[in-house]
């Protein structure tokens, strides 16, 4: 047990027998005043030369290592690849620097293990036989052969005895490839005997000729001598490529002292590439080892970013479609309000969704593709695969939005139908009025009908008014019209649409009230107005009357007919204008009869209201100034400004009275409140008897 402890401490480890190293543990001790360690750069704290010399003397004199944390305090964690390049300060002049020639077998083995741990095969392989020739004992040769066999199987696997603070690495993210170690076997990695081996680090400091040691930061030297390193297990960077995916095969090995040590041998694997073993390439292992993880994280973030971009793109497309449909619906409602008779039904089918992005797979949920027939739609809470960035869960919400819009459109249709229902009685009344007028127009007497037939025969056509006969009459009356205007007049006169203007069509045109009033307005406006094809026959008739081209009885019948029509038409026109005005008001503003009454109140109604108020308030409220009759009828010479001004106090009231008024007239209207009720009552009794005599 003493030999094991001695070998453990001399090997520069901080392993306590009986404790099992935790493979994923990485301990970095930070204190105030200590500068942070840059990844890939190791800081090794060394004591003074005198302190190192004293410790070496103590260790060589006692034949064993120093006990306790003093020896361990001089080391600090650092990457294992930089420990091979460190150069320790020279010892005192009396001390001899260590060389590759071993003082004892354990020193050479330790140096070999250090070199094999760092993967420096090109520098060590040729030197291996020379070191073996210098060994004096067969036991040491046997240990070297055993070590070479182990190196041949996995030369990059560091021994368990070297897994201490001297070989501590800051690669915390490689804890998953740490090889398991048995708790009580410090020298089991190479099967070395536990007996006569003296430590190399405890005796003479090992020289690292390639690089000078970094200067420790101020304050770090004092703190490094007081820190105790907990047990931890690390792996050299070479194990990442050689044994990260190969399990170790532990096996029992008999040592010289009779103890049984577990030998951990990795499975044979390919050698690491030379650029990994290169010292210049391994100065920043954290960056090199973090590179495989960055693409994975970048790929994950890129996928998430693509998913978010696809989601936002679909969301914006949904919003654009919804806004466009909303604008179309608004325009449709505006057109429906302008022309309520031409309402178009709302399509009940839901609108087609926009095309999904190219990243989304073609096989999506059936309810996402509304146009294509398929199985029943999935529920709202159905799970969607994470690899599809198409936001299919937004479709039910969009459907709900369309339902709301349909409901709003239906509500607008209801309001329009209600307004239309209110307008229908007025329109029906107008239609009835037109029908009654047409019935009255159709009811012609025999004399009136004979008079219009005689006018029809003037055109001298073959039983109808044709283009040639109409053109001849127009030329006779002095009208200059084009053939196109003649054709338009004939087409307008063809009421039944058979292509011929017979007497029935001619009679319907001449008895049409609208055409008659249109011709009257056209003649009243200006004589230079262009000829209207719809009223061309009415324009010819007055000229015939002036020329006395018709018999006197015919002219009298036609003249009387149109005079009655004009008189009845003016009254009906007024009624029509009033009805049309009411319709326009109902379309713009709701009809309120009380508002119309309040806007136009007749004078008699105002007087009746005043008399009613006077009768109600005269008896109980005689003292109130508002119940008293004003002095306007009794004072015709009073100034208008005085009358309009409201009397506020007795001084103003006295000024308002003219000096011509008698005191008995002034007293009942401008009496002070300080007078008694008796005097007021006596004066008020005198007023009704005097008013009728003066007003009549």
UniProtKB/Swiss-Prot annotation:
Domain EF-hand: 481-516
Alphabetic keyword roster: Calcium, Coiled coil, Metal-binding
Organism of derivation: Macaca fascicularis
MF terms in GO: calcium ion binding
Residues annotated as binding Ca(2+): 494, 496, 498, 500, 505
Annotated PROSITE patterns: EF_HAND_1, EF_HAND_2
Keyword tRNA-binding: no
Region (Disordered) residue spans: 1-301, 329-386, 646-696
Regions annotated as coiled coil: 424-451
Protein name: Spermatogenesis-associated protein 21
Biased composition regions of type Basic and acidic residues, renumbered to the chain: 67-86, 195-209, 275-287, 676-686
Phylogenetic classification of the source organism: Eukaryota, Metazoa, Chordata, Craniata, Vertebrata
Keyword Cytoplasm (UniProt): no
């Amino acid at each position: 047990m003493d030999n094991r402890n001695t070998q453990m401490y001399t090997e520069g480890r901080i392993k306590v027998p009986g404790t099992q190293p935790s493979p994923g543990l990485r301990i970095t001790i930070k204190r105030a005043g200590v500068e942070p360690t840059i990844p890939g750069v190791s800081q090794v704290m060394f004591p003074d030369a005198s302190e190192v010399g004293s410790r070496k003397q103590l260790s060589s004199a006692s034949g064993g290592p120093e006990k306790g944390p003093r020896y361990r305090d001089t080391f600090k964690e650092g990457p294992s690849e930089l420990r091979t390049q460190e150069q320790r300060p020279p010892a005192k002049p009396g001390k001899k620097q260590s060389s590759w020639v071993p003082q004892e077998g354990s020193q050479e083995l330790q140096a070999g293990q250090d070199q094999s741990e760092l993967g420096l095969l090109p520098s060590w392989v040729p030197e291996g036989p020379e070191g073996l020739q210098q060994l004096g004992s067969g036991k040491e040769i046997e240990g070297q052969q055993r070590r070479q066999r182990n190196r041949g199987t996995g030369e990059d696997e560091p021994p368990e005895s070297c897994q201490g603070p001297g070989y501590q690495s800051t690669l915390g993210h490689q804890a998953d490839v740490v090889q398991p170690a048995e708790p009580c076997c410090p020298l089991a990695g190479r099967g070395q005997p536990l007996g006569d081996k003296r430590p190399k680090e405890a005796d003479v400091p090992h020289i690292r000729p390639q690089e000078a040691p970094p200067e420790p930061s101020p304050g770090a030297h004092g703190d490094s001598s007081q820190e105790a390193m907990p047990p931890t297990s690390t792996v050299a960077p070479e194990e990442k490529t050689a044994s990260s995916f190969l399990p170790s095969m532990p096996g029992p090995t008999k040592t010289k002292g009779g103890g049984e040590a577990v030998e951990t041998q990795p499975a044979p694997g390919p050698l690491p590439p030379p650029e990994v073993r290169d010292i210049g390439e391994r100065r920043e292992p954290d960056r090199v080892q973090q590179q495989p993880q960055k693409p994975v994280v970048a790929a994950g973030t890129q996928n998430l970013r693509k998913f978010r971009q696809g989601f936002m793109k679909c969301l914006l497309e949904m919003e654009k479609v919804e806004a466009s449909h909303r604008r179309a619906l608004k325009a449709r409602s505006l057109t429906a309000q302008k022309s309520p008779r031409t309402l178009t039904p709302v399509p009940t089918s839901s609108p087609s969704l926009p095309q999904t992005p190219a990243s989304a797979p073609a096989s999506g949920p059936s309810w996402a593709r509304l146009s294509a027939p398929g199985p029943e739609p999935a529920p709202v809470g159905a799970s969607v695969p994470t690899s599809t960035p198409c936001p299919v869960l937004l479709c039910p919400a969009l459907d709900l939005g369309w339902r709301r819009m349909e409901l709003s459109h239906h509500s607008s249709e209801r309001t329009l139908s209600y307004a239309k229902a209110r307008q229908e009685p007025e329109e029906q009344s107008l239609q009835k009025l037109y029908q009654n007028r047409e019935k009255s127009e159709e009811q012609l007497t025999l004399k009136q009908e004979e008079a219009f037939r005689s006018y029809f025969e003037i055109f001298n056509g073959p039983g109808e008014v044709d283009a040639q006969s109409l053109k001849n009459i127009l030329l006779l009356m002095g009208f200059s019209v084009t053939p196109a205007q003649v054709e338009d007049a004939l087409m307008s006169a063809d009421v039944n649409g058979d292509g011929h203007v017979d007497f029935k069509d001619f009679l319907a045109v001449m008895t049409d009230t609208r055409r008659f009033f249109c011709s009257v307005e056209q003649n009243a406006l200006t004589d230079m107005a262009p000829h209207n094809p719809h009223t061309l026959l009415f324009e010819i008739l007055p000229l015939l009357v002036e020329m006395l081209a018709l018999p006197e009885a015919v002219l009298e019948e036609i003249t009387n007919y149109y005079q009655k029509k004009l008189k009845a038409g003016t009254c009906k026109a007024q009624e029509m204008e009033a009805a049309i005005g009411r319709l326009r008001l109902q379309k713009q503003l709701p009809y309120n009869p009380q508002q119309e009454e309040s806007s136009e109140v007749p004078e008699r109604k105002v007087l009746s209201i005043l008399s009613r108020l006077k009768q109600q308030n005269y008896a109980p409220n005689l003292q109130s100034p508002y119940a008293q009759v004003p002095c306007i009828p009794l004072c015709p010479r009073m100034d208008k400004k005085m009358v309009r001004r409201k009397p506020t106090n007795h001084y103003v009231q006295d000024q308002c009275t003219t000096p011509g008024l008698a005191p008995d007239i002034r007293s009942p209207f401008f009496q002070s409140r300080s007078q008694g009720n008796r005097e007021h009552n006596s004066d008020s009794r005198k007023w009704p008897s005097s008013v009728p005599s003066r007003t009549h």
